[in-house]
Structure formats: structure tokens, C-alpha cells
Amino acid sequence: MDTTAAAALPAFVALLLLSPWPLLGSAQGQFSAGGCTFDDGPGACDYHQDLYDDFEWVHVSAQEPHYLPPEMPQGSYMIVDSSDHDPGEKARLQLPTMKENDTHCIDFSYLLYSQKGLNPGTLNILVRVNKGPLANPIWNVTGFTGRDWLRAELAVSTFWPNEYQVIFEAEVSGGRSGYIAIDDIQVLSYPCDKSPHFLRLGDVEVNAGQNATFQCIATGRDAVHNKLWLQRRNGEDIPVAQTKNINHRRFAASFRLQEVTKTDQDLYRCVTQSERGSGVSNFAQLIVREPPRPIAPPQLLGVGPTYLLIQLNANSIIGDGPIILKEVEYRMTSGSWTETHAVNAPTYKLWHLDPDTEYEIRVLLTRPGEGGTGLPGPPLITRTKCAEPMRTPKTLKIAEIQARRIAVDWESLGYNITRCHTFNVTICYHYFRGHNESKADCLDMDPKAPQHVVNHLPPYTNVSLKMILTNPEGRKESEETIIQTDEDVPGPVPVKSLQGTSFENKIFLNWKEPLDPNGIITQYEISYSSIRSFDPAVPVAGPPQTVSNLWNSTHHVFMHLHPGTTYQFFIRASTVKGFGPATAINVTTNISAPTLPDYEGVDASLNETATTITVLLRPAQAKGAPISAYQIVVEELHPHRTKREAGAMECYQVPVTYQNAMSGGAPYYFAAELPPGNLPEPAPFTVGDNRTYQGFWNPPLAPRKGYNIYFQAMSSVEKETKTQCVRIATKAATEEPEVIPDPAKQTDRVVKIAGISAGILVFILLLLVVILIVKKSKLAKKRKDAMGNTRQEMTHMVNAMDRSYADQSTLHAEDPLSITFMDQHNFSPRYENHSATAESSRLLDVPRYLCEGTESPYQTGQLHPAIRVADLLQHINLMKTSDSYGFKEEYESFFEGQSASWDVAKKDQNRAKNRYGNIIAYDHSRVILQPVEDDPSSDYINANYIDGYQRPSHYIATQGPVHETVYDFWRMIWQEQSACIVMVTNLVEVGRVKCYKYWPDDTEVYGDFKVTCVEMEPLAEYVVRTFTLERRGYNEIREVKQFHFTGWPDHGVPYHATGLLSFIRRVKLSNPPSAGPIVVHCSAGAGRTGCYIVIDIMLDMAEREGVVDIYNCVKALRSRRINMVQTEEQYIFIHDAILEACLCGETAIPVCEFKAAYFDMIRIDSQTNSSHLKDEFQTLNSVTPRLQAEDCSIACLPRNHDKNRFMDMLPPDRCLPFLITIDGESSNYINAALMDSYRQPAAFIVTQYPLPNTVKDFWRLVYDYGCTSIVMLNEVDLSQGCPQYWPEEGMLRYGPIQVECMSCSMDCDVINRIFRICNLTRPQEGYLMVQQFQYLGWASHREVPGSKRSFLKLILQVEKWQEECEEGEGRTIIHCLNGGGRSGMFCAIGIVVEMVKRQNVVDVFHAVKTLRNSKPNMVEAPEQYRFCYDVALEYLESS
């Protein structure tokens, strides 16, 4: 049977064996075509014999005789005699095909008879459906049934368009004896009355490998007792799996075929059998489908590090369709797990794959039905690309540090780091040394090696190392690690720096540190020995001597040396590693003058005449050089000339002959010069013997004159000459006639005296000119010396701050700079150099103006003299004793009230122009405006000229404009050509109007002036506004800047002067040299205005002269305007401000100069073993205010003790952020302080890490002060009382504050969490979005973070978030363990970054000083202070 016919089989057949009763009821029914009584033979009924069987049925007719035994029934019927045929042969009789769409009952008679009672064979009934092949019999009977007819029914249902044909088949058995007969076949057009039958059995379709279930539903009487089975077309029986009664006339039977395959595909039918017969269903087909499978593997379209793009190639398949699902199955070829994704498109992108990994990809196809998924298709084996490395090794450690090599260890570079199986690791390093020497290099290394050595490094040098991990797709650089190489022996002392200064018996040797110290110099060793001498008596073969100097002593005095002797010095430096190579120098001591015998008390005169005197000459002893000559000098005695004392004296260095002495008027002459060989032993010599000795004439002495006779010994070596002399005799005048020398040997004395006189006059004139020049140069040098010594004086002041003031008189007496090195060693050079060179330094880096005079512009009185800058600290401390009695006394000595006429200001028409009736302009110094036409009184404005430092009328002090004077104010600005306005008040203070707003926010017209605000720069303590000023009728646009200081409190004076000093410097830098006066005003134009002007003037004076004269400056200002500097508190504040400026100096560095300046700042001074950066930090510590107990009174209250982590790190009362939200009995105190940023006051809140009992207070602080950022700089550590104070997910309530975690992400060293918080006591205020930045890059045991770059990135991330939230107005909370060093460093760097953006300068000192003014423990360690500089440099280099 073909598949189509079998699938459409609609007939249900039921067969029942009846009892051998005659059919009674059937005759009453309606007959249909197909029945036959065989009276006229089978042909008449359209019955046919099968053409393909073995033999045929035989027709027995009642009208014809037959051969049958007599016991056979009478009548007409069809019969088969089995004895005539072989066993197994079959005869088939075919009924007509039935097509009616109806239910039929086929009723017939049959018998199987054998005379011997044997089995005649089998009667089968077959049904052919739609002319298909024959199936197995649907009913059969076999064996002997007797000679009586039996009746049977067959119930059949036919459904159009199907048809069926019933076939009676007689099969001969092995007995071959008997007869098989059928008769009286009736086809009824209604169901059988007693025959059970099956409903239509449907086809079953399953996928290969699944279970197939056929369900047969049977109806009829007693059907529940039937036996059931499923019969395959080939006869295989399958037992019933389950039966279920539907009702009393119907039941269902299930048949299950396990895990079918294609071989199980066939036709199946249900068979039921009871005591009355059997029932058989139609054939239903079991259809087995093969699940589909792709023929080709997927095709690769694209590849990346974490994805693969494929085309499924699922159109060509093996198996059966339709395809209802496509899936991609993939796995790592090195792994066992698989993952499957459903696909709805012809292409698919596999995401989240591992880089550089081989994957096997297959396609799965699914058809309908259970088990419809076929086997995976052929695999595509491919590999992803490499990805950029995840990071560099975190555990970069130094395994070994030597002087010239560093061994580096790092963690194993696993795939999770490299993201590629092919990668390179490079170590790059660079370093800077002195003398602008630097080196940078990169070394490739074995990736599998756990250690690498960097060689050829300089000793004791900070080497910056970083690791670079590279693969084909990218690279990752580690943060730089700075390692200092070990010390080594130092290099040689520079030859050029080695200098020796010779004396007769000592040598002063000085040198400089080796160019390559290779560490910290611990000492210098100098060995020396004599190698030759001009004095033969000096031994030169002795052993060398050795001396040692400390590291900071680069000079030495070698005493007790031999004159005229050359010494060889070998000097070498030492570190902890030992001595380096030596540097040699030869230095020769000066020769000494010969030593003459002592003539004191000895009469050397042997004989004396009127014209001669004979003396005893004794030989001298050479000292350092042999005697070159002996000389006899004759000095004429004059009555008015002081006699020389006997013994050692100034010798006569210039040899003068008798002739030259007579012609030149010299008081002495050389009578003789004797070679040393002429005086081996004492010998007499006659002075005046009229002989010549070595070119010197020894003339007879004049009898009437007295003479002193001197004996000189001279040594001379290599242009060095030393002379020793002694008076050995005196010859008195006699009464004998004067012996006139030979005229031939004389010259005209008159002519010579005249020449000498003229020369003397010329010399005197020249001397006067030189004196005038020197005096003028000294006056000009006065200012330079004052400026040059300022920094030295500042150093003394800073050092003095931590000393006791018990003996202030010794402060300068012990100044080591006041005693030179030569003085300490009793050196007396022949020509003293009185000029001193001082280091040039700046007190204030601002523009200066040249001036003619050098005197102070103020009259310094005897009772109030100017104070040296170096004495200022001592002076202020003295004045502050006894409750500042000194300041009180000084201030009260000022004249209070009106000191000059102010008639113009008092006029009625000007009264409205004065804010206060008692602070108005003096007539003599008032600013006179050019009158407006037709208004003669319009020349008045309440303003006075004030002289600056050596600049007349450099300032204009004025009141804060009132509404009536705004136009006058701008007239004054235009008339005076002022470029800067300084405003030292707020518009309203304590509810009172202090100044009318005289400027526009955009553009405003005041009379004939148009003022436009073009720029506004708000800063924490002041605002800079830039205006353009235009006047009707003038083709000119001027720029005017207003500097508005907002940091002056409503009462008193600023707590510190740092902000005001920065403000003053900014004004100085902004005021053009050619501009007119600086206009300064507060409210009245007296108190704060006076403070500003006095500080500005005194800072100029301190720089120019090294002194300050505050008292007389205030006095001078009060002569120009009434009550300038209005309170004693302001007067003291001026002193404190100038002291702070002098101590701190100018620390701002322009961006363009920062890198070079910074490297200079960190360079170690070999003399002091310190650096400028270290000194700056010490200065910062010295000027940091110390908090007293009364400053922190609220934090010290007993109820607040348990809210403080450390009782020595408390916030001052003036900086406390008091909590607003009420939380039961809890106080409004929290250990936190408000801090200014660069642009915004109180922008930072610095606090300690919340304690377990202050977590609720912390969240109250966040909400009450609108904090949109939380910066966390330490770790959660329960052992230190640092709990997790936030919810990791979901929502938690902390007192009245509800905190909900919205998201959490990580970026490098920062975990970012966004919280949404609300105040449950004030829900109408809505939510506040807060982002927490938890910084992970700062180990608890380190003073500074491990990476400059990551810390800078943190600051910039916070800054960006702040700009996005709350229109940039939200505050930032920064906390670390104690709310000090780490938090301060974050704030300081944030200020510096803003400073660079706004002003292009770097001023770390000012940033930290500003923070410490509020809380002294900001930036605690020198490492943190230097790190601020390092990050500033990192920011400049990266931007």
C-alpha cells in the first residue's frame, strides 16, 4: 500500500462471530448493493475471482447436481475443496467495490467441514483500500466448525472519497481434507446491531528517536472485555499499553512504539476480539521524520576580540523539514562546555567571547514535534582576535636594588591580564640627574620570566619605572614606580672646583661636592705631604698626613706648614659605600720674610764719626727661601716726624737711591745692598763710606743731621719677595760743617720738589673724584642690599618662630652670615673686600616703578622708627604681650577725628553725596571732578588722593557709591584713567546697605557713560569683573577691572590674611604701569580701605628697603583722609598680614616655568642636605595657625566626645557645618569642617570616616548641605571603627534619611555608586542624587597614592560630576580616617587644577595654606605636599 492511500484510509471495520442462529432481523432491514445469495452464480452479483491467486472458488447451484457428500447443505453457495489443493494455496473471491459514504454492516454465512473432523483450512476476510495492496487478514476462522451454517457480521464505515473492497480468502491447511463454504452475503446500510467496531484510526507522525503512540477507540456491547493489540501490516503484534473506559459503550486503547526509526515506518491497525468475535480497525500509517541537519558548516563573516559574526548556511539540509528553529551551538575547542543561542536571521553575532581563543561553532536545526532537533552540522573552527590588555601587573615589586641595577618582580602574566596568547612585556625607565642629564630607555623582556634586571643605572637616583604590556591589539602602561638606586662610592671632586689659597704657614683649601655624589656624602678625606721646598732645610720625604671633614664642610685650613713649600693634596669623598677616587692638587705656601737677629737692647754701633757710623751686621735666618740680599737703609730724622720704634716694623719695599731721594724728597735712601754671601757671619759695615754697593751709593752722612740706620734682609722666589728689617742704630746730628755731596751726583732739588708738588695735587683731585663715585654707588646699592638680604632675613624669622624669645638680643649677634670664614680663622688678607654678595630673591613678584630717591616717603619718628623685616616677628610678639598693650598704645596715639578742612564736602548741595556725615573728603586732598555744564557743585565726590610707595596719588580712597553718586563715580574713573577698582565690602552686611550696586550685570547707561560687563570670574574669596567703559562723544573704549573682595566678615577682620594677600597680588599684576590711580572703597572709605592701602604700600617698602613703617604710614594716610584704619583690630591685622607675606613670600609659579622650577625645588643642596621644597614645607608648618582649646569648644563638649575619632584632630567652631535635620536627641554636631575651593566658598566638607554611632549624622550632613559627591579615601575596616555606611543594593534608612543604591560600577581604581537620598521628615523636598567615589589606589600604610595619574583622574571625575549635578552648586564631602592629610591633599590638588585653568599658575603653598587656615592638619606629611606638586606636573603634561 502506498503512503498516500494509507494516509487517507477512512473505513472502520468490525467483525463479530455470531452464534449458529439464522439471521432474522437482517431481512427486515434495507439491503445495499454488494450482497449475493449465489443462486445465479457469483457473476450475477458482480463477484470476481482473483486473477493472481492459486485456485478459484467453486459455485454450487441448487438446480444442478454436485459431487459433494450428502451431509453438505443444500442450496446455492460458493465452496472450496481443500483436498484438491496443496497446503498454503489460496483462493480469493472479490466483492464489488463499495464507495457509498455510509456505515455498512456485511452479514454472511460460512462453514468449515470435514468428514473426519479434520481441519479443512482457514477462511480469511481481507479488505483492500483504494485499490491498494492487500494487507493481512482482518478476520479469519480455521478448523472444523460443523456442517451447519454460521453467521458473522462485519461493520464497515466508508468516508468519501475513499473506497474499499472486501475479499473472502480460503487457504488450504496441511490436512487437505474438507470444505470451506460461504453463502448469503448481505450488505446492510446501517450499523451492525451486535458487532463492535473501531472509530477511525489516524496516522501518527513522529521524529526519529521518539516514542509513537496509536490510540484506538472501540464501540459495541461488552467491548470492555475484548482483547486488544496493534497489528503491523507485516503481522507483528504490539501489546496494549493502556486502556481507559470512556463510557459503558466505548473505550480507548493506547499502543506505544519506543524510539522509532525509519525502519519502523509502516501501516498499523487495531484488533479487538471477544467471545462473540473480533473487531479490526483501519490501517493507519506511522510516519517517521528525520530531524534536519545542515550540510555545510557556518561561514565566518567577521571577527573581533570578543565576537564572531557568522552566516548559518542552513538552506541545504539532510533530513526532513519544515525548519521551525535555528540555533547556534559553540564551545571553546579547549573546553567541554557548550552554549546554544536561538537565531532568527541568516547571520548571527556571538558576543562576550574570550579574546584570542579558538571556538568550534555548529548550527542546530529543529523541525516540528518532540525530538525535532537534528544533530549539529559540520563545525566551523575559528579564533577570536586579541583584545587590548586588561591591565598591567599590579604587584610590580622591587626584588633587589643595587647602586647601578634594579631587579623587578611582577605577578604571573596570565591570560586574564594579557587577553592574548601572543604578547610582549617592556620595562621603560627614565631618570634625571644634575647638570641637565637625563636618560630614558625601554627594555624588551622575556614574558615568561618572573624577574628582569635593569642595568647601567646611576647610583642614588630616583628612577621612574613602568611596565608596558603589549599585544597585537593594544597596550597598557602601568603607573610609574619611583625607585631610588642604592648609593655607590662617589665620583672625584671636580678638579676645577679645587682651589687653594696660600699663606706662609697655612693653606686654605676649598672644593665642591663631586659632580656624581652617587649618594649622600658622609665625609671628605684629604691626605697631604710636602713634595718640594725652596728652603733646603725643610724635609720633603715625610709620610703623608690625613684629615677628615664632615659632609657639609667643603673647606679646610691646613696649619703649621712650612713656608715656601709645595704640598700635594689628595681629596676624596665618601658615602656609606666607601671612598671614591681622589683628586690631586699642588699648592705652595708663601715664603716668609727672613728672621733677623734681635737687636733690641743691643748696641749695634761700633764706631761713629761726623759723616759715618759703623754698625755690626749679623746674618739673618732664611725662612722658606734663601736670603736674596741684605740692604742698609738710611732714614733722615726730622724734628716733626714721629720716631719709629725699634724692632719689627714696616720695611722699605721700594729701593730708592740717594740721588732719587734727594730729587724726589724721599725720607730715606738705600745706602747699600749686599749679596748674602758677603755676610756669612757678623761683620762691621760703615754707613757713609762714600762707596757704591750693587748700584747704591753710600754717601757720607751730613754732620748736622740725625739718621736712623736700618738693616733689611730680603728673600725672593718666583716673583714673590719678602723683606724683614730692623733699626740697628741712630746717629745724632753734630756741630761739624756739613759735608756737601758731590754736585756731579746731585740734581736740582728745586725742580724736583716742584714736580713732586704738582703730582700730589693731581693725585688729590683724582682721589676726590673717586670718592664721589664710590659714595653715589653706595647709595644706589642700598636698595639692592635690602632686597637681596630679604630672603635671609625671612629665614631667620621662620627659624625664630619655634624658639624661645627669652634672649632676643642674640638673634642677629649669632647670625652665622655676619662672620666670614676668613674671620673665623684669623685670616688677614692685604686688601680687604668690603662688598658682600647676597642671594637675590623676590618678596613679591609684581611690577615695580623706578624712583629717584632712596629714603622712606614717611617721616620716621624717634619713638616709632621703621622696623627691619628680620625684626618684624620679634616686634609683633613683643607688641602682643600683655593683651596687645603695645598695639593699643600705638593705635591710641593716632589723632582721631578731623585734622584738616572739609568745607566743600560740608556744602548743602553736597550733603546727599556723602554716605556718612562724619567721614567726608578733606579739601586739600580731595578728587576734584571736572564740573558738568551748568552745575558748579558737580566737581565734588567723597574721595581723596593717597600717596603710594614713592608714587604720589597712587590710590584714590573713596566711599561706597550711593545712588546719587553712581554717575560721579564713573566720571571719576574716566577722568583719572583708572584701570582697577578695589571693593572691600559687600553690598549688604548685617541687614544694612553698605554700598549701592554701581555696576551692571550686562549693559547699563549712567549719564553719558555706557558700562558693559564682559566677564565675571567668581572665586572663593573675591570676584573679578571686567567692564568696558564708553563715553558719549569720545571714540574710545576703556577696560576697567573691578576686584571685589567678598571674604571680609561682617564684623571685625578676616581670620587670616592669606586670601587678602592673594587678592592684593592679583590687583598688582592686573594694574597696567601707565594706568591712573587705583580706586579703593569699602563702605565709608576709611577702615577697610585704609587696611588695604597700608598693606599694599608696606609690602612695596619691605621689598625695596627691607624695612616696614606701618605706624607712620597710617599716620600719613590719616593726614589725607579721616580715620584711615578705623580700629585697633584692623591695625593689628595689618601687622599680621605683612608678617605672613614676608614669611611666605611669593610662591605662585607660572605654568610655562613650572617644570623647570619644580625640578629646581626638589634638588638637594649638598651644603644643607635639604631642598627648597622641603624648606617651603617647613615654612608652611611654621606659619600654620595652632588651634587652641577655645577654638574647638563645641567639639570638646562632653556630649560630643564620642563623635570624635581623635581628640587631637577637632574642627574649629568657625568652620563647623551644623546639622539641620532633627534626629531625636542627637546633637547638631559632626566632626567636619567647611573648606573653600578655588572658585566657591565652603565647596568642600572635610570629615573623618563615619564612626558606627555617627553614620546617621553623616547622611544628615550629606542631605542638609546638598552634597552631590562623596569621596572616600580610605578602606572599610571594622577593626578601626570604619563600617560600611551605605547600602550595596536596595534601600536602607539611616535615621531620618533614606538611602537607595541606584547603580554601582567600577572604573580602574574607583568604584562609582549612585545613591538617591531623601529626607523622610521633609518628603516635599524631593530626592537628592549623590555619587560616591570610593578610591582604591591608596594603601593604608602609604602616605600618598600609588599613582599620580589615577588620583588625578579621580579628581577630574568628581569635578565632571559636580558640573553635571545641581548646576554645579553641590558640595563635595571628602573623608579619610581622620579627615586630615588625605582629604586635604584631595582639596589642595583640586584647588591647584582650578588655579591652572583660571590663572595659568601653580601655587601649591597657597592652596595648602588656605586649607590649613581652616583646619591645621590638612596635608600632613612632606610626601603629601610633594605629591601635590607631582600631580600638578602630571596635569600640565597630560593636558
From Swiss-Prot:
It is found in: Cell junction, Adherens junction; Cell membrane. Residues 31-194 form the MAM domain. This protein undergoes proteolytic processing. Residues 196-281 form the Ig-like C2-type domain. The active site is at residues 1082, 1376. GO terms for biological process: cell adhesion; cell migration; cellular response to reactive oxygen species; cellular response to UV; focal adhesion assembly; negative regulation of cell cycle; negative regulation of cell migration; negative regulation of cell population proliferation. The record marks 643-644 as: Cleavage. Residues 294-389, 392-488, 491-595, 597-680 form the Fibronectin type-III domain. It is an enzyme of class 3 (hydrolase). Disulfide bonds join 216-270. Residues 775-1439 are cytoplasmic. PROSITE patterns: FN3 (PS50853), IG_LIKE (PS50835), MAM_1 (PS00740), MAM_2 (PS50060), TYR_PHOSPHATASE_1 (PS00383), TYR_PHOSPHATASE_2 (PS50056), TYR_PHOSPHATASE_PTP (PS50055). The chain crosses the membrane at residues 753-774. One of its GO terms (cellular component) is membrane. It comes from the Eukaryota. Regulation of processes involving cell contact and adhesion such as growth control, tumor invasion, and metastasis. Negative regulator of EGFR signaling pathway. Forms complexes with beta-catenin and gamma-catenin/plakoglobin. Beta-catenin may be a substrate for the catalytic activity of PTPRK/PTP-kappa. Belongs to the protein-tyrosine phosphatase family. Receptor class 2B subfamily. This is Receptor-type tyrosine-protein phosphatase kappa. It comes from Homo sapiens.
